[in-house]
Amino acid sequence: MKKLTSENSHRQQKVASIINEALIEILHRGKMLDPRLYDCPLTITKIIVTADLKIANCYFLPFNTKLTPQEITESLNNSKNAIRNFVTGKINMKYSPDIRFHYDHGFDNALKVEQLLKDTNNI
């Protein structure tokens, strides 16, 4: 039985890195994307590729935008096929991973923890 580890293999990290570079390039160009993404600066915070390299979970953080995280996720998912085709051209694999977009709640959670710590210090 195969041992499950939380560590990513070198191959997973390499695929995540290539996907990250391709995402940055296509988001910068803005071609073939949902029009709502044109004026929506995004940071790709992390990409986690499954062990079988079939799924890439991409976490993003928007900056200075009027769109909600749900609207941005919807826009990215509407553009998923164009993004996947672009990534396929950059990656040398038999199958291109399915790209799934998620809002990164890490920053929001850090702010909540910081506020809780401030509140407890004031007691």
UniProtKB/Swiss-Prot annotation:
Molecular functions per Gene Ontology: ribosomal small subunit binding
Coiled coil segments of this chain: none
UniProt keyword Cytoplasm, yes or no: yes
Gene Ontology BP, a term: maturation of SSU-rRNA
Cellular component GO terms, alphabetical: cytosol
Top-level taxonomic group: Bacteria
UniProt keywords, alphabetically: Cytoplasm, Ribosome biogenesis
Pfam families given in the database record: RBFA
Cellular location(s): Cytoplasm
Record's function text: One of several proteins that assist in the late maturation steps of the functional core of the 30S ribosomal subunit. Associates with free 30S ribosomal subunits (but not with 30S subunits that are part of 70S ribosomes or polysomes). Required for efficient processing of 16S rRNA. May interact with the 5'-terminal helix region of 16S rRNA.
Family membership: Belongs to the RbfA family.
Record's subunit section: Monomer. Binds 30S ribosomal subunits, but not 50S ribosomal subunits or 70S ribosomes.
Name under which the protein is recorded: Ribosome-binding factor A
